[in-house]
């Protein structure tokens, strides 16, 4: 008795110790899980902080590069929007890949479903063929017997043999019916399982498709908003480089000092002619090169050839008319100098 009591006491003590160890292990596992979750959170925070630091450094470098340009803030905003657009493109790619995977999975499921249905149809046809081969005219014989009952049975050896054959046929037909019933039950069970699986898959697929459509609609709306913002920013800051070549008008006050010339100067080069209109009171210079080659004066539609002092040798052979006098050349030079001085003062 004492030995049994000691064994029982030691066994109870061992069980208590095991329970304590199990409880301690569970507590330690829970603490380890908590620490693991905290480490994952800290790791995610560190990754986000690193990404923020990298983006800040890139933004600082980009802002330093763009600070000297007149459209620096606009370029910075566009760079930030470009990053957002890149993120949206990546999300669109992931969504497209998921859609492709979903479509492939649905195709696989539908192929399996079609294969199962084809197998069921074949087995059903085979069962009908077997039944028709085993008892081809059961229904017809039953109808005939019901309308034309046969004579009474007589105890003869031929009738006994016929009865034994009919009994054996009935037993065989009963076995075949049992086999066909088992096959049909198994096939119906398989069909029901496949149908339930297909229903679950279709329900999940519809839910996933609706979620994807909502996400695509949201992304498209965000993309449209970003594009509108880009258009507005581009419209608010138009390009002013096309107006740099337009100069203010120049007026020539000393009109009496200019001598009128005849209309016989029409054979001179077209680049050196200057047409004078009655209504033009000032000169609109579209460019510096054109300002150096044309001047408009308010007179009664006369033609002037204002020569360039550097091109006297080249133009001496082309000028024709009544410009052989030295006085007219001096007057032309004075007119050219006055026009150049006015243009320089206006610039």
UniProtKB/Swiss-Prot annotation:
O-glycosylated. Residues 307-316 have a biased composition (Low complexity). Residues 153-174 have a biased composition (Polar residues). Residues 149-177, 303-332 are annotated as: Disordered. Keywords: Coiled coil, Glycoprotein. It comes from the Eukaryota. Residues 76-109, 206-233 form a coiled coil. It holds the Pfam family SIKE. Involved in protection of the schistosome gut. Belongs to the SIKE family. PANTHER family: FGFR1 ONCOGENE PARTNER 2 HOMOLOG, SIKE FAMILY MEMBER. This is Circulating cathodic antigen.
């Amino acid at each position: 008795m004492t030995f049994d009591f000691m064994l029982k006491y030691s066994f109870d003590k061992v069980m208590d110790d095991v329970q304590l160890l199990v409880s301690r292990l569970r507590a330690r596992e829970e603490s380890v899980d908590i620490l693991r979750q905290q480490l994952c959170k800290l790791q995610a925070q560190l990754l986000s902080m690193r990404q923020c630091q990298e983006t800040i450094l890139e933004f600082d470098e980009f802002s330093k590069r763009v600070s000297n340009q007149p459209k620096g803030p606009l370029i910075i905003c566009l760079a930030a929007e470009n990053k957002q657009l890149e993120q949206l493109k990546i999300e669109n790619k992931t969504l497209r890949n998921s859609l492709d995977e979903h479509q492939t999975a649905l195709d696989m499921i539908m192929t399996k479903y079609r294969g199962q249905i084809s197998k069921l149809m074949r087995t059903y046809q085979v069962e009908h063929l077997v039944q028709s081969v085993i008892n081809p005219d059961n229904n017809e014989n039953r109808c005939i017997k019901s309308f034309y009952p046969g004579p009474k049975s007589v105890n003869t050896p031929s009738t006994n043999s016929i009865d034994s054959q009919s009994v054996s046929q009935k037993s065989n037909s009963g076995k075949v019916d049992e086999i066909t019933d088992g096959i049909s039950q198994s096939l119906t069970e398989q069909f029901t399982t496949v149908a339930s699986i297909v229903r679950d898959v279709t329900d999940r697929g519809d839910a996933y498709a609706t979620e994807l459509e909502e996400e695509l609609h949201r992304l498209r709306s965000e993309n449209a908003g970003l594009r509108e913002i880009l258009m507005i920013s581009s419209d608010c800051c138009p390009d002013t480089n096309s107006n740099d070549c337009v100069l203010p008008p120049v007026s020539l006050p000393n009109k009496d000092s200019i001598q009128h010339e005849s209309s016989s100067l029409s054979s001179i080069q077209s680049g050196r002619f200057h047409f004078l209109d009655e209504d033009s009171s000032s000169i609109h210079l579209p460019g510096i090169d054109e300002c150096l080659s044309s001047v408009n004066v308010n007179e009664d539609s006369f033609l002037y050839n204002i020569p360039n002092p550097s091109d006297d040798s080249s133009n001496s052979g082309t000028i024709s008319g009544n410009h052989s006098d030295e006085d007219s050349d001096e007057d032309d030079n004075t007119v050219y100098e006055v026009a150049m001085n006015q243009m320089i003062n206006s610039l």
